Amino acid sequence: MTTSPGGPETKGRTAEVDINPVSASLEVAGKPGHFNKSLSKGPQTTTWIWNLHALAHDFDTQTNDLEEISRKIFSAHFGHLSIIFVWISGMIFHAARFSNYYAWLADPLGNKPSAHVVWPIVGQDILNADVGNGFRGVQITSGLFHILRGAGMTDPGELYSAAIGALVAAVVMMYAGYYHYHKKAPKLEWFQNAESTMTHHLIVLLGLGNLAWTGHLIHVSLPVNKLLDSGVAPQDIPIPHEFLFDNGFMADLYPSFAQGLMPYFTLNWGAYSDFLTFKGGLDPTTGGLWMTDIAHHHLALAVMYIIAGHMYRTNWGIGHSMKEIMESHKGPFTGEGHKGLYEVLTTSWHAQLAINLATWGSFSIIVAHHMYAMPPYPYLATDYGTQLNLFVHHMWIGGFLIVGGAAHAAIFMVRDYDPAVNQNNVLDRMLRHRDTIISHLNWVCIFLGFHSFGLYIHNDNMRSLGRPQDMFSDTAIQLQPIFSQWVQNLQANVAGTIRAPLAEGASSLAWGGDPLFVGGKVAMQHVSLGTADFMIHHIHAFQIHVTVLILIKGVLYARSSRLIPDKANLGFRFPCDGPGRGGTCQSSGWDHIFLGLFWMYNCISIVNFHFFWKMQSDVWGAANANGGVNYLTAGNWAQSSITINGWLRDFLWAQSVQVINSYGSALSAYGILFLGAHFIWAFSLMFLFSGRGYWQELIESIVWAHSKLKIAPAIQPRAMSITQGRAVGLGHYLLGGIVTSWSFYLARILALG
């Protein structure tokens, strides 16, 4: 191991970086396929372009050196961050330059957000609708305006500065990626130092990140939003640097500011309860969470993460060792427990990525549900289009990330799993019990599928025969979700009890309580549950379990199975076990991801359908003269969604009227997308239903015709491989299906307002 030259600071210890390890060459980097000896020769056949895409980021195929792979991944992270900063900059620039943000700030109930104006080239300006006060543009549903208001941005200069700042950050990140690969590249030991990594992530990123955001919320967001809520015009509100250190200005809004830091140092922290609160529920002015609750929440997280970050043994020889924690973690039925997993997670980035993807995918789904039950930003709750979009967006992200977790778990099993390291630990025992696990999971899927779908089939039969008294419904044979109702009641009444003694209210109105109206629209209310909810819940359970069955089977059988004992030698993706063995196709780890994605699509689609209809029926609506609510679909969920016919008639057909009739209106783009995405989806079936041989024969006859005309191409055309065909089919299937449903949702909710 080499040490860095010179300087007393490195004396006696090894350097953590290599200086100038890889020369930077635009000539090399600009050559397609430079990372692969075969690809770098250029295309001989059309297969080259497919292999180029498949292998460009598959660093394992480019080198066996774990340090080099680690450096490439680390460098790529900075490139990824750079792209994110450019994306953020673009959104904020649009808000500053092309939007009605300032009009929306002044009257968020009378204006719809728009940050996109379509140019009138051949009539596309029909897409620009009047979103309020005469501003014509495309209504956006990203939540951009709500988060900018929540952050306290009221001045064009702030938005332009943020947009430019994000571009500067993008350049810095891009340079950092270059610097940490070509100039000073970390050594493998640096990447494998789990304790220092945890300390840095917990204290610096999460702890100080939360603390910094708490500071912003208290010193910028709270005063600006309080002034906006009290009716002060945005242009009359001073920009942050004008009041940041003006305690008199702040004390007028939050009196405890007059006391400065004295309450903090005298442990009289309760004095700050005017801006660090525990109110619960939603602010009746904006329909969002109380900004003071949000500040309190982030302060608590900051304290927790900073304390947690001091847990691990780094420079001073005190604290926990990650390896020791794992090796001492044994249960009565887990053999050697987590022994060996430290080695797994420090030598296989696929294993670590699998855990992170599954975790963050689950977080994304949790975020989707929190965004409507506890809308964090001002006036988000009554912007139904944005509410819907944020739910659908985070559900799809969650689904894809979880499947990605299974993909990298299978890659880990094929490429990185070492049986010698995993002896009788939890991973080894999972593999030894895989037949039991899969057969039980299969039984659960069969049970859930027949019983949950059977309830719907029963109801369709009874309704078709004119026997409503024999249906499963709230008015006949009831299947009430009593446990869910119990949890709702428990949470609705939690404030002031021993479980939440300091809370002034429940965390969400979804648990119970009267509707909260903002501008005459329901921001949130009690989400009542009944037989229809019990039934669709079990459909969700069925689809989740089938998706998990496919993914878990792919992971547990990635290395071997009774059918193909030497599967590990065939790699992560292979079409079949050679030409001599029939019936071995679609058994690779890759194929399980391929199949799992279809079921993930089914699963998330029904979740989104459920959410969209349920909210229209039982939550979203306008206040009527009697103090009640006129719901968008008049509460038809409970009786219509309990039959398959009801789903087809009252949801898919009845609610697609807006997108089907959108031509000639500002929503016509959604009609075009709806039609085009159906075509893309149908086009996918051509790839999924036909085999490679058909296309190769067709190509050869076409090449023959070109040769006769002496216009044969230099690059030999070749049909896609079986795996490539499946990938292209899957991509079109998912793209077509998701865009079809997305355009349907948006056209309807924007038309209803």
UniProtKB/Swiss-Prot annotation:
Compartments annotated for it: namely: Cellular thylakoid membrane
Q: Where does chlorophyll a' bind?
A: H678
Q: Name one GO cellular component term.
A: plasma membrane-derived thylakoid membrane
| TM ranges | 73-96, 159-182, 198-222, 294-312, 349-372, 388-414, 436-458, 534-552, 592-613, 667-689, 727-747
- Mainly localized where? membrane
Q: How does it associate, per the subunit comment?
A: The PsaA/B heterodimer binds the P700 chlorophyll special pair and subsequent electron acceptors. PSI consists of a core antenna complex that captures photons, and an electron transfer chain that converts photonic excitation into a charge separation. The cyanobacterial PSI reaction center is composed of one copy each of PsaA,B,C,D,E,F,I,J,K,L,M and X, and forms trimeric complexes.
Question: What protein name applies here?
Answer: Photosystem I P700 chlorophyll a apoprotein A1
Question: What organism is listed for this UniProt entry?
Answer: Acaryochloris marina (strain MBIC 11017)
